[in-house]
């Protein structure tokens, strides 16, 4: 757990996919725009034999003018390519098998080259498996199969190079920035299976090329018949059924070829990851979570949640109101005051989610937070990884944070045992390292004035503790903490990247008193 948290604090979370917006097929004249009016030729009507009323020229003009007034939209990565998703387990296994053979042949060629007079590895001391050719094989395979395998690759991209080799980190950084999208026929098949053959009756138009492609699905821009712009997320076929096998195949392959560090993916963390991926593949669950957050944040002055489009929601298709804005990592050019406000609100949201709602969207991807400068609000996206927290967990967890904020090391140790982080039989080296890690993370809540997130060395200090924490841990941490600490680390990282100065102590103290007031009881004493 501390390994994941420390690594998260060292680098950025992966974007959903952005850079150069690809023009629609109609604009490129590769083939007709397949449904609805072409975005770049809006007055043109194609497929007029399809059922449903198309937009009038006046409606198109008004929609275009409204779109120009709205905030920027995410854009597809220029590295993304149209590529069929292997939908069956056999075809996905074949992809991993082909990768294993390719890595072996590539490594053999590299070793052979080294054995020749004057030969050497591409990088001195590097693994023969991690040649440029093999790196490209890994990237291409993960971007082809997508699903759980690509998700793990994106997770590994944010590990610090003290945990995985710089070579492997560079490989997974390329994976993080790339995600291919499925071809038209495969996407059409999913839409027809989920929404029926008459799904076109539900929309006025839907763009053929997605504006985002990620590990589980891709997102298309569409327009309802009333002119409402929507984002339609379509899941890749086969990814939900292949979660466990994909995880096992990829990790076995990587451990065999490039040697992932011991403890990076412990058994319990793998089980938790597989459960989270299963949640993310259930779009009906995600729609329900989005609606829950929309109610919880209905009166919030800073955050908004797009409306769910019920008629476009199934297990593998999710329609929501289209949102505009820029991801958090693109807010660095804003004024110090605006950056402080954004980060303050982000931390306030995290504390509300955990200690007021006890329901949190745990994906720290910066593309899930879109800042709209015109309204000075942030739109929240992607609720697939949302989860609830029980009161027993939050009762103890808030006391751990409170002890760290108060600088009480003994109470941090005791409350960590109450939380079942520790058994009480750990070595002194482990207990000291655990307490020190908690105290480091509690520093923003202990500072009497504004805390300068950009000036701290939080990540480096925690990284130094990780070897001890891995070597001497007697029990896995509570399963709730895997996702929780990813989210908190992502929030701290955003504050550091934006060089925010925030008075965190008052924010937490207010949260603490409100929490116990809502529980109508006194803070829990330490267990004897």
Swiss-Prot record:
Segments carrying motif AAAS motif: 212-215
One cellular component term from this protein's GO annotations in UniProt: mitochondrion
Residues that coordinate or bind ATP: 215, 233, 320-323, 368, 382
Active site: 363 (proton acceptor)
Enzyme Commission numbers on file: 2.7.-.-
Keyword Transferase carried by entry: yes
Entry coiled-coil feature ranges: none
Motif KxGQ motif, residue range(s) on this chain: 151-154
Any one of the GO BP annotations: ubiquinone biosynthetic process
Superkingdom in the source lineage: Eukaryota
Pathway: Cofactor biosynthesis; ubiquinone biosynthesis
Transmembrane annotation, as ranges: 93-109
A Pfam family this chain is assigned to: ABC1
One GO MF term: protein kinase activity
Known tissue expression: In the kidney, expressed in glomeruli, predominantly in podocyte foot precesses, as well as in proximal tubules and collecting ducts (at protein level).
EC category: transferase
Cellular localization per UniProt: Mitochondrion membrane; Cytoplasm, Cytosol; Cell membrane
Key words, A-Z: ATP-binding, Cell membrane, Cytoplasm, Kinase, Membrane, Mitochondrion, Nucleotide-binding, Transferase, Transmembrane, Transmembrane helix
Disulfide bridge map: none
InterPro entries: ABC1_dom, ADCK3_dom, Atypical_kinase_ADCK, Kinase-like_dom_sf
Residues in Protein kinase domain copies: 187-419
Entry's family note: Belongs to the protein kinase superfamily. ADCK protein kinase family.
Assembly description: Homodimer; homodimerizes via its transmembrane region. Interacts with COQ6 and COQ7. Interacts with the multi-subunit COQ enzyme complex, composed of at least COQ3, COQ4, COQ5, COQ6, COQ7 and COQ9.
Physiological role: Atypical kinase involved in the biosynthesis of coenzyme Q, also named ubiquinone, an essential lipid-soluble electron transporter for aerobic cellular respiration. Its substrate specificity is still unclear: may act as a protein kinase that mediates phosphorylation of COQ3. According to other reports, acts as a small molecule kinase, possibly a lipid kinase that phosphorylates a prenyl lipid in the ubiquinone biosynthesis pathway, as suggested by its ability to bind coenzyme Q lipid intermediates. However, the small molecule kinase activity was not confirmed by another publication.
Record note on domains: Adopts an atypical protein kinase-like fold: while it adopts a core fold similar to that of well-characterized protein kinase-like domains. The KxGQ motif completely occludes the typical substrate binding pocket. Nucleotide-binding opens the substrate binding pocket and flips the active site from inside the hydrophobic core into a catalytically competent, solvent-exposed posture.
Record-given protein name: Atypical kinase COQ8B, mitochondrial
Gene source species: Rattus norvegicus (Rat)
């Amino acid at each position: 757990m501390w390994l994941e948290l420390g690594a998260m604090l060292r680098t950025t979370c992966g974007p959903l996919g952005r850079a150069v917006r690809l023009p629609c097929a109609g604009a490129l004249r590769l083939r007709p725009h397949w449904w609805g009016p072409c975005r770049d030729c809006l007055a043109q009507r194609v497929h007029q034999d399809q059922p449903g009323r198309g937009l009038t020229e006046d409606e198109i003009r008004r929609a275009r003018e409204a779109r120009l007034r709205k905030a920027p939209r995410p854009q597809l990565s220029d590295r993304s390519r149209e590529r069929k998703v292997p939908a069956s387990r056999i075809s996905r296994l074949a992809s991993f098998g082909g990768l294993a053979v390719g890595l072996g042949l590539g490594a053999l060629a590299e070793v052979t080259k080294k054995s020749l007079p004057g030969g050497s590895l591409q990088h001195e001391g590097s693994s023969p498996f991690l040649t440029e050719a093999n790196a490209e094989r890994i990237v291409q395979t993960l971007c082809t199969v997508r699903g759980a395998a690509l998700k793990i690759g994106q997770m590994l991209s944010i590990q610090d190079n003290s945990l995985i080799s710089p070579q492997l980190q560079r490989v997974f950084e390329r994976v993080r920035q790339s995600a291919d999208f499925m071809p038209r026929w495969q996407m059409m098949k999913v839409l027809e299976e989920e929404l029926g053959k008459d799904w076109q009756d539900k929309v006025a138009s839907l763009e053929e090329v997605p504006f985002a492609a990620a590990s589980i699905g891709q997102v298309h821009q569409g327009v309802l018949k009333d002119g409402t712009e929507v984002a339609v997320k379509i899941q890749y076929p086969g990814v939900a059924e292949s979660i466990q096998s994909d995880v096992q195949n990829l990790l076995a392959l990587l451990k065999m070829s490039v040697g992932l560090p011991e403890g990076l993916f412990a058994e319990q963390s793998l089980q938790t990851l597989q459960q989270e991926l299963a949640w993310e593949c259930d779009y009906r669950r995600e729609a329900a979570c989005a609606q829950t957050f929309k109610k919880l944040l209905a009166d919030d002055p800073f955050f908004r949640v797009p409306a769910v489009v019920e008629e476009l929601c199934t297990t593998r298709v999710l329609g929501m109101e289209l949102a505009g804005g820029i991801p958090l990592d693109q807010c660095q050019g804003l004024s110090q005051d605006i950056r402080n406000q954004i980060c303050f609100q982000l931390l306030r949201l995290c504390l509300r989610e955990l200690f007021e709602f006890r329901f949190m969207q745990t994906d720290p991807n910066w593309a899930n937070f879109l800042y709209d400068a015109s309204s000075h609000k942030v739109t929240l996206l992607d609720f697939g990884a949302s989860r609830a927290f029980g009161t027993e967990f939050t009762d103890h967890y808030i006391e751990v944070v409170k002890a760290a904020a108060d600088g009480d090391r003994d109470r941090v140790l005791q409350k960590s045992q109450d939380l079942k982080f520790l058994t009480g039989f750990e070595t002194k080296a482990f207990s000291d390292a655990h307490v020190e890690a908690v105290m480091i993370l509690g520093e923003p809540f202990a500072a009497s004035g504004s805390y300068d997130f950009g000036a701290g060395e939080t990540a480096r200090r925690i990284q130094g503790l990780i070897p001890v924490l891995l070597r001497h841990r007697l029990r896995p941490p509570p399963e709730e903490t895997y996702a929780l600490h990813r989210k908190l680390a992502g929030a701290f990282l955003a504050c550091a990247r934006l060089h925010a100065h925030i008075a965190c102590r008052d924010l937490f103290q207010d949260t603490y008193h409100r929490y116990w007031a809502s529980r109508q009881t006194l803070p829990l004493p330490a267990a004897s």
